[in-house]
């Protein structure tokens, strides 16, 4: 939790104002931030200086794992984060590749499960990684990438957290996740939960111990309409102890994640927090 607040303070102290053309707002911005999550110790990085909700973040991750491309599918599993980008983003509404209400296009999980090949076929990146790791194989290329510039025009949003690189050392699995851009007050809370949970799940379904997750962010920013709440409220609160994430031990395969797993299979224990803060969201 301290590393999160340290990043927020760094942005406030050292950040540069940058105009964001997509949102029409200014962002206080720093370049390069590194966060580390001790998955092996189950120090779940759920923000404690404001009330935070983990289930929507895990639901979104589950939707990516399943390759969902429709906001309605995300809603069914408890995640509403794609409603605005699918239906309120004017550039996407005018895009000829949009198939209709709730369509997200070829974003995130679609790329992870069905990356298009020149011959017309697709590559299931996640399946390959799971198969390798289950056999104890790390070919130094166990990489899940959502970043496909050739199809950016076919989706409502470029991926922010775009690449997950798995590394197997002995019987311990580690993860390095790369993020090009991060809305620190709102998005990072989601992203931290997802990086942690992705490593925990992948270790569980491939039969390994979970090690450390490394989260690398390039552009870390606070929007101008979020700054006052962060600077004058959240950052002044004392962080509390990290909670624990409990995952149903019956989840043993990628097929389980694709079929029957729900948010009831995840529980956070020992979560103490300060009062909620409602930050503005920028579409």
UniProtKB/Swiss-Prot annotation:
Top EC class for this record: transferase
Pathway info: Pyrimidine metabolism; dTTP biosynthesis
Subcellular location: Cytoplasm
Residue numbers binding dUMP: 22, 180-183, 191, 221-223
Keyword Heme: no
Catalytic activity: dUMP + (6R)-5,10-methylene-5,6,7,8-tetrahydrofolate = 7,8-dihydrofolate + dTMP
Cellular component, GO annotation: cytosol
The EC number(s) this enzyme carries: 2.1.1.45
Binding residues annotated for (6R)-5,10-methylene-5,6,7,8-tetrahydrofolate, in chain numbering: 183, 282
Top-level taxon: Bacteria
Any one GO molecular-function label of the UniProt entry: thymidylate synthase activity
InterPro entries associated with the record: Thymidate_synth/dCMP_Mease, Thymidate_synth/dCMP_Mease_dom, Thymidate_synth/dCMP_Mease_sf, Thymidylate_synthase
Entry keywords, A to Z: Cytoplasm, Methyltransferase, Nucleotide biosynthesis, Transferase
Active site feature: 160 (nucleophile)
Stated family: Belongs to the thymidylate synthase family. Bacterial-type ThyA subfamily.
Function: Catalyzes the reductive methylation of 2'-deoxyuridine-5'-monophosphate (dUMP) to 2'-deoxythymidine-5'-monophosphate (dTMP) while utilizing 5,10-methylenetetrahydrofolate (mTHF) as the methyl donor and reductant in the reaction, yielding dihydrofolate (DHF) as a by-product. This enzymatic reaction provides an intracellular de novo source of dTMP, an essential precursor for DNA biosynthesis.
Subunit record text: Homodimer.
Protein name per UniProt: Thymidylate synthase
Organism phylogeny: Bacteria, Pseudomonadati, Pseudomonadota, Gammaproteobacteria, Alteromonadales
């Amino acid at each position: 939790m301290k590393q999160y607040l340290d990043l927020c303070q760094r942005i406030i102290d050292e950040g540069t104002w940058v105009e964001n053309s997509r949102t029409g707002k200014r962002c206080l911005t720093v370049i390069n931030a590194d966060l580390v999550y001790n998955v092996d110790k189950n120090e779940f990085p759920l923000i404690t200086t404001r009330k935070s909700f983990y289930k929507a973040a895990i639901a979104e991750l589950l939707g990516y794992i399943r390759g969902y491309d429709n906001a309605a599918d995300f809603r069914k599993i408890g995640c509403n984060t794609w409603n605005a980008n699918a239906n309120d983003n004017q550039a996407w509404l005018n895009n000829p590749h949009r198939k209709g209400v709730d369509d997200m296009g070829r974003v995130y999980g679609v790329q992870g499960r069905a990356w298009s090949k020149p011959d017309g076929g697709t590559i299931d990146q996640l399946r390959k990684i799971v198969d390798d790791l289950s056999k104890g194989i790390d070919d130094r290329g166990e990489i899940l990438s959502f970043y496909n510039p050739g199809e950016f025009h076919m989706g409502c949003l470029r991926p922010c957290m775009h690449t997950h690189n798995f590394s197997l050392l002995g019987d311990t699995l580690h993860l390095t996740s790369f993020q090009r851009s991060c809305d620190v007050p709102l998005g990072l809370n989601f992203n931290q939960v997802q990086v942690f949970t992705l490593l925990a799940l992948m270790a569980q379904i491939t039969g390994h111990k979970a090690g450390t997750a490394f989260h690398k962010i390039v552009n870390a920013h606070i929007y101008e309409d979020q700054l006052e709440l962060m600077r004058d409220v959240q950052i002044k609160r004392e962080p509390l102890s990290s909670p624990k994430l409990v995952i149903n031990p019956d989840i043993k395969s990628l097929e389980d994640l694709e079929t029957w797993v729900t948010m009831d299979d995840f529980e956070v224990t020992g979560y103490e927090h300060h009062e909620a803060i409602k930050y503005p969201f920028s579409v």
